[in-house]
Design a protein with these regions (language model features):
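Conserved HGGG/HGGXW glycine-rich cap/lid loop of the alpha/beta-hydrolase fold
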Residues: 6-50
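Catalytic histidine-centered segment of alpha/beta-hydrolase-like enzymes
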Residues: 224-235
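Flexible "cap/lid" loop of the alpha/beta hydrolase fold
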Residues: 95, 101-131
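Active-site loop/oxyanion-hole signature of alpha/beta-hydrolase fold enzymes
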Residues: 41-81
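Gly/Ala-rich beta-loop-alpha elbow adjacent to hydrolase catalytic centers
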Residues: 82-86, 90
Length: 247
C-alpha cells in the first residue's frame, strides 16, 4: 500500500482512508488544514490509482493498514477516519484491533449488505466501463457524485487509471459489507457522520454503527449528500476534528 503524507513527523498521527473510486485527494484540504499540528497519513487503497496492488477484500486492506501501524507506530495512532469504502475498512480495522486509535470518524459507511446491488455491478460495469475514458461521461458521473468542481481533473485522471476488475471488486465488496461482532469491543471514541440527503440504506447504516459502538455519537449533516463533508467541506471537517479532540 502506498501513502501520501503531510505535516510534522513527531506529531500525533492521523490516518484518513478515502472513498471508493477516489484517492488521497479526497482528504487533501483536510490534511492541509491540519498539517501544522498533526502528522497526516493518506493511504491509497488497493486497486486505486497510484496503488501498488489489486483490490482483494475490505478485510485485507484493513490488515495491511494494521500492519503498517504496527511497523511504524508501535501499534496505535491518535485518530483514524474513513469515508464510504474507507469507512468500511476503518470499521474492519476497529473490529480486528479494538485499541488501535484513540478517536475514529466514520463517514457514510454502508453496513447493510445488498445481494441485489452486488449482482448488478459486474453487468453494469461490463457494459459501460469503456465510457469512463470519455470526459463527457465522467463529468456526468462527477456531477451526480456532488464533488466540488476543482477536483474534476483528479477524479477523471484517477478513475481512468482504475482497472475494470478492480472497480468491480471494490464496488462488490462495498455492497456486501456488514459489521463484525467484534466491533462492540472497540475502545476508541467514535464519531459517526451521515448526510441528511443520503439514501435510506446509508441513514440506517449510520444508526446501526452508532448502536453497535458504546462510545460513539451520531451526527446527521443537514443539506449534505454522500461524502460531501470530507470532500467538499474539508476545513469544516478539520475543525470538527479539533472540536472532538478539545471537547
Amino acid at each position: 500500500m502506498n501513502y501520501v503524507e503531510y505535516g510534522k513527523e513527531k506529531s500525533d498521527i492521523i490516518i484518513l482512508l478515502h472513498g471508493g473510486g477516489l484517492s488521497w485527494w479526497n482528504y487533501e484540504e483536510v490534511a492541509k488544514s491540519l498539517q501544522n499540528d498533526y502528522h497526516i497519513i493518506l493511504p491509497i487503497l488497493d486497486g486505486h490509482a497510484e496503488s501498488d496492488k489489486p483490490f482483494t477484500t475490505i478485510e485485507n486492506n484493513a490488515t495491511e493498514i494494521i500492519t503498517f501501524i504496527d511497523t511504524h507506530f508501535q501499534g496505535s495512532v491518535f485518530l483514524i477516519g474513513g469515508l464510504s469504502l474507507g469507512g468500511q475498512i476503518l470499521l474492519e480495522i476497529l473490529s480486528q484491533r479494538n485499541n488501535i486509535c484513540k478517536y475514529a470518524i466514520i463517514e457514510s459507511a454502508l453496513v447493510i449488505p445488498s445481494k441485489q446491488t452486488y449482482s448488478m455491478i459486474a453487468p453494469a460495469f461490463g457494459s459501460c466501463y469503456g465510457l469512463i475514458q470519455y470526459k463527457w461521461f465522467s463529468r456526468l458521473q462527477f456531477k451526480w457524485l456532488k464533488i466540488k468542481s476543482d477536483l474534476f481533473d483528479c477524479y477523471f485522471r484517477d478513475t481512468c487509471a482504475i482497472s475494470k476488475k478492480d472497480m468491480i471488486a471494490f464496488l462488490q465488496a462495498n455492497s456486501l459489507y456488514s459489521l463484525k461482532r467484534t466491533i462492540k469491543n472497540c475502545t476508541a471514541r467514535v464519531y459517526v457522520f451521515v448526510g441528511r440527503k443520503e439514501n435510506n440504506a446509508m441513514q440506517k447504516s449510520a444508526q446501526i454503527i452508532h448502536q453497535s459502538l458504546q462510545k460513539s455519537s451520531l451526527q446527521v449533516l443537514t443539506g449534505l449528500y454522500h461524502g460531501e463533508f470530507s470532500i467538499n467541506h474539508g476545513k469544516d471537517y478539520a475543525n470538527k476534528i479539533r472540536e472532538m479532540i478539545e471537547g
